[in-house]
Structure formats: C-alpha cells, structure tokens
Amino acid sequence: MNPEIFAKELAKYGFELNEKQKKQFATYYDKLVEFNKKVNLTRITDKNEVYLKHFFDSITPLLEFPDLFKGEKTLCDVGAGAGFPSLPIKILCPNLSITIVDSLGKRLKFLDELVNDLGLDKVTLVHSRAEDAGQNKDLREKFDLVTGRAVARMSVLSEYCLPLAKVGGYLVALKGPKAQDELAEAKHAIDVLGGKVEDVKELTLPDTDDDRTLIVVEKIKATPKKYPRQAGTPNKKPL
C-alpha cells in the first residue's frame, strides 16, 4: 500500500487527507525507519508495508467506529511502542487528546521527537508500566477511550486498560485473526473489571489476506480498587 493508495482507501471512508496530513505520515515513516536503526521499534520497515500494516491497521478503529472518536475525546494508548494505534488516529483527528503509556524510555524518546516533528499538540507521554498507570489517581478512570494493539492477550489487556477507562468509556482492542477464542477466555476478566463487550468487528486489510479483529468493550461500572494488580501479576496469573 503506497501513500497514494493509502489516501484513496481512507477517502472511501470519508477521510480526505490534506497536504499537511500526507506530509505528517511521510515524516512519520522517515522518522520511524531512521530511529529504528538505533532502537528496535519494528521489524517492518518497507514503506508500503508500514503504510498498510502500521498506519492503515492503526486507523481501522476510526474507520469502523467513527462515532467513538467524535468531539473532544481523551484517548489513552497502552504500550503504544512506536505510536500505534494512537498517533495515526491523532493525525486524522487533531481534536483528540492523547496520552501514551509505555514502560521503555528509549521508545518514549522516539515518540517525544516524533510528536515534535509532526507538530502534534495535546499529546502526553507517560513513562510507566500499565499496571502502575491504572493505579495512578491522575490516570485511573479518566479516559473516554483506551486502546491496545499487539500488547497482550485479551484477558491481560483488559486488566491493563479497563481501569484507565472512565465509566461510559470504551476499550478498543486491535487484534489479529480468530480473536473469538481469546475473547471467550477473557469474558470473566472483562466482567470483573467493569466491562461489557459492545461490538466485535472482523475485517481484512485491503488487497491482502491479513485478517484483523476489533473488539470494543464498554466500561459499565467502576473497576474494583484492587485492579490492576501489581506489575507482572496480570500476565503471570490472568483473571
């Protein structure tokens, strides 16, 4: 998917990229490849692959559930790595306020430089484990949307993310193919943490056989204070 096809695909969903946005994605790609030589951010560096498997893939929640992103929403991206999915979404939705939580300082250095180079405002970077962020009173139950992509299986991801969503907010999980088994396994965790599965959308990336699953979980009640448990526990002993 070259930049021109990327723009055409987005236009099918009513998102017409302006010149500034096209330039932001081009800068994002250049910066990602340049920084990746020093810090391992991604194994995908081919331009067409980055536009498809990072940029377009990150934007799929916005394309499939546009109403979730309307207005002056707050979004927390847990374990964003090289900024996925939140920063591609931010380029298309400048009104979003983004908070990125990541535990690796080197990745945050990249993100800090990237946000500056892209000229993005309302982006906050937090150096923290997800479990600690969920117990931080400045972050807990503060966000309209919480995203997670390639972070952990659904039961673990729910414990990382749902404590950060406000009641009435949503967790949007970007998953690979056949996520239904993972979701069934996570049903208890989602319930305990105050969530309810609102929607599951299966899709295929354009002109590929790459299947993806988007899982939307609504936060319907407050998360019990004991969750998330201390760092490392959710992954070792999933709910």
Curated annotation (Swiss-Prot):
Pfam families: GidB (PF02527). This is Ribosomal RNA small subunit methyltransferase G. It comes from Lactobacillus johnsonii (strain CNCM I-12250 / La1 / NCC 533). SUPFAM superfamilies: S-adenosyl-L-methionine-dependent methyltransferases. The keyword Nucleus does not apply. Its EC number is 2.1.1.-. One of its GO terms (cellular component) is cytosol. Keywords: Cytoplasm, Methyltransferase, rRNA processing, S-adenosyl-L-methionine, Transferase. Gene3D superfamilies: Vaccinia Virus protein VP39.
